[in-house]
Amino acid sequence: MDAQLLQANKRLLRRAANVRQRYKMLATESFVADIKQILLRFIQKPNVIIMYISVLVLFAAHIDSNTHDILDDLAAQFPNNTFIEWAKSNFFRICGALVFIPVIIDTEEKHRNYLALVIFVFLMGFPQRSIMEYFIYSISFHVYAKAKHPVTRIFIIGAAVFSCVMFGIFTNEQLRKLYAELPKVPTHPVAVNRVEKVANRASRVSTEGTVNFG
């Protein structure tokens, strides 16, 4: 029985590797295949699965009214600890940070600090979001960092903006104000002078023509 189970696991791993390789070959031809091979490789990693399961367990313990989660226990043991009090009031930020950890670990070392800084600003600069939103944003960050097809990054940026509007991070009124505050593109002075000269010349011709015909 153990030998059969081992063989079955090997077949599944071999099949998954073949699928990932096929998507990797197609990544340069299709941005959909690019996204598929990135997600397939990412989700198969044990540290990613363990971290996501840990976040789900932490969230389940938090929403269970009959169970005190670990933050409640720590707050009872250390009532004057400001960090624990902050963590209790920022529970979803903590979960979001845990969700983003696999993304930071999986990125290239030369980009790791930069990505960690961007994620820190995102977590602390915006109001707390739901765990599902943090999961979507973490996947978006990962796909953007690993993309090989040029259209993939454009698609991720568009999807991220759409998600921010849909989840209420940016409202339509805020987007309109942002658009209104964008600097206007200045017109080149030479072009302005040429336009003014043409307009003045046309005005003089029109005036002279009117006088002559009068």
Swiss-Prot record:
Transmembrane segments: 43-63, 84-104, 116-136, 150-170
Lineage top rank: taxon: Viruses
GO terms under cellular component: host cell membrane; membrane
UniProt topology in membrane: Multi-pass membrane protein
Keywords assigned: Host membrane, Membrane, Transmembrane, Transmembrane helix
Main location: host cell
Keyword Membrane belongs to the record: yes
Coiled coil: none
One Pfam family this sequence matches: SP24
Protein name, entry field: Uncharacterized protein p24
